C-alpha cells in the first residue's frame, strides 16, 4: 500500500507541475479560458490528492479507499484537463466523450472521499474505527 501511495504522491506532484505549466501558458502564450480552467482543475485536484494520500496513511483500515479517491481525482483531472487544453490549442478532442469521462471520474473521486470519511467513523467488525480515540 505504501508504494501505491508514494506513486500517487509522485503523480500528484506531476499533476501540480502540469497545472503550473498550463497557468504559465495561459498567462504568456495562449490566453484561453479553457487553458486557465484546465490549470486550475489540475492544481486543485493535485493538492486534494496529496491530502488524501496523507489520510490514507493515517487511517490504515480505510487507506485503500482514500488512495482510490486520490487516483480517481488525478486520472479524472488529467483526462478532463487534457481534453480542454487540446480543444484550446488544436480544436480537437483527446477522444470522444473525454471531458464527460474525466468529469465523471472527478465526481466519483469526491463521492469516494465522502464515503471513506464516513466509513472511518464507523467501527470495523470486531474492532474500532480508524478515528482518534479522543471524544
Which role fits each region the language model picked out?
Residues 2-3, 25-30, 51-68, 87-90, ...:
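Juxtamembrane membrane-water interface segments of multi-pass membrane proteins
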Residues 4-28:
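N-terminal signal-anchor transmembrane alpha helix
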Residues 14-22, 34-62, 71-82:
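Core segments of alpha-helical transmembrane spans in multipass integral membrane proteins
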Residues 32-40, 92-104:
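Non-cytosolic membrane-interface motifs at loop->transmembrane helix junctions
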Residues 102-135:
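A generic hydrophobic-segment detector
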Amino acid at each position: 500500500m505504501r508504494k501505491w501511495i508514494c506513486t500517487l504522491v509522485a503523480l500528484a506532484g506531476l499533476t501540480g507541475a502540469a497545472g503550473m505549466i498550463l497557468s504559465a501558458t495561459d498567462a504568456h502564450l495562449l490566453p484561453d479560458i479553457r487553458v486557465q480552467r484546465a490549470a486550475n482543475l489540475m492544481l486543485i485536484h493535485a493538492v486534494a490528492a496529496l491530502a488524501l494520500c496523507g489520510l490514507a496513511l493515517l487511517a490504515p483500515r480505510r487507506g485503500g479507499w482514500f488512495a482510490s479517491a486520490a487516483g480517481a481525482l488525478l486520472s479524472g483531472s488529467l483526462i478532463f484537463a487534457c481534453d480542454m487544453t487540446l480543444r484550446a490549442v488544436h480544436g480537437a478532442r483527446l477522444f470522444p466523450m473525454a471531458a464527460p469521462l474525466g468529469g465523471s471520474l472527478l465526481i466519483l473521486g469526491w463521492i469516494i472521499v465522502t464515503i471513506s470519511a464516513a466509513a472511518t467513523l464507523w467501527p470495523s467488525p470486531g474492532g474500532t474505527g480508524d478515528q482518534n480515540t479522543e471524544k
